[in-house]
């Protein structure tokens, strides 16, 4: 392995880091019909127009919390890939146990 440690580049010098596209306003990708379908699944018949932005805000906060915890588990295990189990443990930590994804 030539002393590069776990996951080191094999040949060459490794190359420059590629710039990632800055992600913003992706919450608008949760479309009005998608929110409507979730509400229908929950048994809602009629939806106020103000609900959509509010739902996006609540969903964003919820996902930020879950992802933060999942990434913490990943970093503690010294991995770079977030696994399904990291997400399951993150949800369990917040009192929302999820079944069906191992563990």
Curated annotation (Swiss-Prot):
CDD domains: HFD_H4. Residues 17-21 bind DNA. It comes from the Eukaryota. Residues 1-20 are annotated as: Disordered. Keywords: Acetylation, Chromosome, DNA-binding, Nucleosome core, Nucleus. It is found in: Nucleus; Chromosome. GO terms for molecular function: DNA binding; protein heterodimerization activity; structural constituent of chromatin. GO terms for cellular component: chloroplast; cytosol; extracellular region; nucleolus; nucleosome; peroxisome; plant-type vacuole; plasma membrane. Pfam families: CENP-T_C. Residues 1-14 have a biased composition (Gly residues). The nucleosome is a histone octamer containing two molecules each of H2A, H2B, H3 and H4 assembled in one H3-H4 heterotetramer and two H2A-H2B heterodimers. The octamer wraps approximately 147 bp of DNA. Interacts with ORTH2. Interacts with AHL27. This is Histone H4. The lineage of its organism: Eukaryota, Viridiplantae, Streptophyta, Embryophyta, Tracheophyta.
């Amino acid at each position: 392995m030539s002393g590069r440690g776990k996951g080191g580049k094999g040949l060459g010098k490794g190359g420059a880091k590629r710039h990632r596209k800055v992600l913003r306003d992706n919450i608008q990708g949760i479309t009005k019909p998608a929110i409507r379908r979730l509400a229908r699944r929950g048994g809602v018949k009629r939806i106020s127009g103000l609900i959509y932005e509010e739902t996006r805000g609540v969903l964003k906060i919820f996902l930020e919390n879950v992802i933060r915890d999942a990434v913490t588990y990943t970093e503690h295990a010294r991995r770079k890939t977030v696994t399904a189990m990291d997400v399951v443990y993150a949800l369990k930590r917040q009192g929302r146990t999820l079944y069906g994804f191992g563990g």
